[in-house]
């Protein structure tokens, strides 16, 4: 697989059929991601946190805050999709979000703490879904698809 956009090293998301085993693996990813991020950055100093993770990319500091921001969006989108009939979600400009004062000034441990709480809620919510609940959709106007 040739990578044409370094922002997406594994490629852009394309929905595919999935097995129950794959779903359980994804649920485990959601459950344990905060631990993985915390462990990955635990021994980094401020200089390392201020280092871009790739040429032209965000710093590790920005990336940690971005994960918290994007996962809050994802959690809300899952809830909207569950509670409403194919709701249109609001896209957001991720590049603008990493320039806000909270991202610039707060330590990454704030977003790590947020991720632990958020992922506990998200995982519990997803584990409660049954059968056809997993077939519900949202509409993303930026991608113009469900």
Language-model segments: which ranges?
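Aromatic-glycine hotspot motif
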Residues: 1-58, 72-146
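Histidine-centered divalent metal-coordination motifs
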Residues: 66
